Amino acid sequence: MAAITALTLRSPVYLPSSATSPRFHGFTNQPPPARLFFPLNPFPSLSIQNPKSIRISASASPITTPILQTEKSTARSSTLTGSTRSLATLAALAIAVTRVLAQKLSLAIQTSSPVIADGLRFSLSTAGPVFFASLRDRPPGYLNTPLTVVAVGIKKWLDIYSGVLMVRVLLSWFPNIPWERQPLSAIRDLCDPYLNLFRNIIPPIFDTLDVSPLLAFAVLGTLGSIVHGSTG
């Protein structure tokens, strides 16, 4: 509710002029002027000394949490816990079944004829050496190291980049090619930094013929031959 403030006004007091200065009454025929006096404290109800006169009332409604949201959150948590429990149960059941099957298989091999057991042991013991022997049967000059895989990947990347560079050089002969469109803009952004390296080294012939792409292709071919020689 709004605050109710009481305001009190005092009526002014009129005093005749004869009470204060009677000498003006005999000289003029007009009625004496009236004087207005106001009290020193016209609004005592609003003074600081009377704080009880100003009242402020405020009401705040209590915050109520919606029951619907709590019910939804509990339902979601229950579904999550239920699904987690079901997955854990299935995983435990699968592990138990595989363990039982492995035990039964080992018992069956032990109780079977010794010929089958000896053949199984022989096949398992010779599988590893045969695998590593097949890895060693490589042509001469082959590097059986992790760097070989990296070298093969670099060689393939150089071949692809050489093809893209060839497309860029061939299309540069046509002046009306829209290089702002895709995929032409991607080709330009990929090849121009590499071509600019050689344009600064070899200037154009007669200021018209640019032969710097020939040097760029020669460098790519040299790198490709080096990588191919390292892979064997």
Curated annotation (Swiss-Prot):
The source's domain of life comes to Eukaryota
The membrane topology noted for this protein in its Swiss-Prot or TrEMBL record is: Multi-pass membrane protein
Q: Does the keyword Transit peptide apply?
A: yes
Q: Which GO terms describe its cellular component?
A: chloroplast; chloroplast envelope; chloroplast thylakoid membrane; cytosol; thylakoid membrane
Q: List the disulfide bonds.
A: none
Q: InterPro entries from the xrefs? A: CCB3/YggT (IPR003425)
Keywords in alphabetical order, please: Chloroplast, Membrane, Plastid, Thylakoid, Transit peptide, Transmembrane, Transmembrane helix
Q: Does the keyword Cell wall biogenesis/degradation apply?
A: no
TM regions (residue ranges): 147-167, 201-221
Q: Name one GO biological process term.
A: chloroplast fission
Q: Where in the cell is it found?
A: Plastid, Chloroplast thylakoid membrane
In the database record, which residues form the transit peptide?
1-16
> What Pfam families does this protein map onto?
YGGT
Q: What else is known?
A: Plant over-expressing YLMG1-1 have impaired chloroplast division leading to reduced number and enlarged chloroplasts in mesophyll cells. Plants silencing YLMG1-1 show a pale green phenotype in young emerging leaves and the basal part of expanding leaves.
| Stated family | Belongs to the YggT family.
Protein function: Required for the proper distribution of nucleoids in chloroplasts. The nucleoid partitioning by YLMG1-1 may be related to chloroplast division processes.
Q: What name does the UniProt record give this protein?
A: YlmG homolog protein 1-1, chloroplastic
Q: Which organism is it from?
A: Arabidopsis thaliana
Provide the gene name from the record: YLMG1-1
